[in-house]
Design a protein with these regions (language model features):
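N-terminal hydrophobic/helix-forming segments and targeting peptides
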Residues: 1-149
């Protein structure tokens, strides 16, 4: 019966040196991404730059694509699509879609946010994603984003 029991293992105790190096190298790449992509627009720019390094070209509507083509489409700097054209028969083999969602926690101010209450200046915010207002008192904030006129 002990063979079926769940045993906790720690990767730091079990992994060899090359595996640990691969783990930390991957984590360092992720750290660079989250450091350089704090908003959706920054994430799109980051991904576009990385895609260009991998040989992706801008997508052009009406241009015929051929197997092996790698193109990207940046939709107004808010989302990006990467496309690698395969060589198989779509009707028989189908297509593979890999999707990722950019979710940037933030305080999103309304168009005219400032108001005063009880002698204190406050800001009206949009509420997305379930972030509690009390969480923001515990972390450093940066002012980033786009100004809308």
């Amino acid at each position: 019966m002990s063979d079926l029991a769940y045993k906790r293992t720690n990767v730091y105790e079990k992994a060899d040196e090359s595996t640990m190096k691969a783990i930390f190298d991957y984590a360092e790449g992720y750290r660079k991404f989250i450091d350089g992509a704090k908003t959706e627009r920054e994430a799109c720019a980051f991904v576009e730059k990385a895609a260009k390094k991998q040989g992706y070209k801008p997508f052009a509507f009406g241009k015929k694509l051929k197997p092996g083509d790698k193109v990207y489409y940046n939709n107004r700097g808010k989302n990006i699509y990467l496309i690698r054209v395969g060589s198989g028969n779509i009707g028989e083999e189908g297509i593979r879609i890999v999707a990722a969602h950019i979710d940037s926690p933030r305080v999103d101010l309304k168009q005219v946010p400032l108001y005063e209450s009880d002698g204190v200046a406050l800001a009206k915010t949009h509420y997305y994603g379930g972030i509690r207002k009390c969480q923001w008192a515990a972390i450093r904030l940066a002012l980033q984003g786009a100004v809308v006129r």
